[in-house]
């Protein structure tokens, strides 16, 4: 367990700015150009209009090191709080992605995080979307910085029989409650710096809520870095509301203007609130209780024989180890893509070309979805899970003619 009263040996650092300072490092560092794509740097605003079934989205790109079309697309959400969804093309969630693309985006993002943060540093990934991204950034930071005082944890919507560190809310989400558990890191002092990782930021409210909760639990935090793939928060001034001096970085920054259209009824009414928390009676620590080093574990079940191209599907919050498996197979020469199931209800159209609905393998009773998985594309599907034998919905297994691969017995 981390000790909030134990002081760490200070690491060399620059003077900390005032809490109200707004520091965005997205364009501050030397631009990274891709030799295969010299136009990667955007030096002029780009504007486009996206028509969705729930309304109209005006997208303005202000800068970045990745083009918009490589990073994300957009879809209509089944959510009255927010009618659109930013659909990442590099996360391995809603859109199938090659592992090397996921790795490159995480590495590029990690390179933009200030390397002189005072330690210990805690990297925090937001459930469910940014868990794999957060763990990948943690992995990259330890390599890039050559430091061992960089740790990882992530928020979760699963209740465990462990001590809760804090709780916070994601107001616009279909599943607003997040839990963070006390890290099981004996002898490790409480962090002095936070690196908060998410796929995108719009108003900054969720990041501020997370930061407030963590600073309340760890008052010794001195500075915060926020790292997101796409930053749409221009004009919201959220840095000034953060509880500690904050820098932010992204691969692309811009602005979104949403005009809601006529209300579109959800395709399926959920019998239970999508914010329901699950409960894991048995749990292996793949990140919820903190990690000092990156994990890379083979499945407990026998790995199926590979015949042809492959799709590896993570489930819910269990995404990092399936990604690592896919990455290893890709290095061995296999044609493999990664994606994952989601609690996010979205309409078909825009970035969503296919949609499967099925029961949650975590037992919450909340419908889950898999998008853009074409069962006729010739790929063999492996469904990866952490929830034990017999927890995967047979309807999903049959729809994809999938083989189930488990990391828990």
What are these regions (language model features)?
Residues 1-409:
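PRPP-associated nucleotide enzymes
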């Amino acid at each position: 367990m981390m000790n909030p009263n134990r002081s760490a040996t200070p690491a060399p650092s620059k003077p900390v700015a005032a809490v109200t300072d707004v520091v965005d490092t997205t364009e501050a560092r030397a631009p990274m150009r891709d030799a295969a794509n010299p136009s990667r740097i955007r030096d002029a605003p780009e504007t486009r209009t996206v028509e969705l079934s729930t309304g109209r989205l005006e997208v303005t790109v202000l800068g970045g090191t990745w083009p918009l079309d490589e990073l994300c697309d957009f879809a209509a959400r089944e959510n009255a709080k927010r009618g659109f969804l930013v659909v990442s093309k590099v996360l391995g969630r809603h859109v199938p992605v090659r592992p090397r693309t996921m790795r490159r985006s995480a590495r590029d993002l990690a390179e933009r995080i200030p390397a002189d943060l005072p330690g210990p540093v805690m990297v925090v990934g937001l459930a469910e979307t940014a868990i794999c991204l957060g763990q990948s950034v943690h992995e990259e930071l330890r390599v890039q910085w050559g430091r061992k005082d960089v740790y990882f944890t992530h928020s979760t919507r699963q209740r465990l029989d462990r001590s809760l560190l804090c709780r916070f809310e994601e107001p616009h989400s279909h599943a607003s409650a997040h839990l963070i558990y006390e890290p099981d890191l004996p002898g490790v002092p409480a962090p002095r710096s936070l690196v908060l990782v998410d796929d995108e930021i719009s108003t900054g409210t969720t990041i501020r809520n997370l930061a407030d909760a963590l600073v309340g639990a760890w008052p010794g935090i001195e500075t915060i870095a926020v790292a997101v793939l796409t930053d749409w928060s221009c004009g919201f001034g959220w840095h000034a509301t953060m509880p500690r001096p904050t820098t932010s970085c992204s691969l692309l920054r811009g602005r979104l203007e949403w005009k809601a259209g006529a209300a579109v009824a959800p395709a399926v009414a959920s019998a239970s609130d999508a914010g329901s928390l699950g409960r894991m009676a048995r749990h292996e620590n793949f990140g919820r209780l903190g990690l000092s080093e990156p994990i890379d574990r083979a499945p407990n079940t026998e790995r199926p024989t590979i015949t042809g191209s492959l799709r590896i599907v993570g489930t819910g919050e269990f995404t990092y180890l399936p990604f690592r498996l896919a990455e290893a197979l890709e290095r061995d020469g296999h044609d493999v893509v990664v994606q994952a199931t989601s609690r996010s209800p979205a309409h078909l159209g825009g970035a969503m070309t296919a949609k499967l609905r099925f029961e949650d393998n975590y037992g919450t009773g909340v419908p889950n979805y898999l998008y853009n998985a074409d069962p006729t594309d010739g790929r063999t599907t492996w469904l990866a899970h952490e929830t034990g034998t017999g927890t995967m919905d047979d309807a999903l297994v049959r729809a994809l003619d999938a083989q189930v691969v488990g990391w828990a017995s």
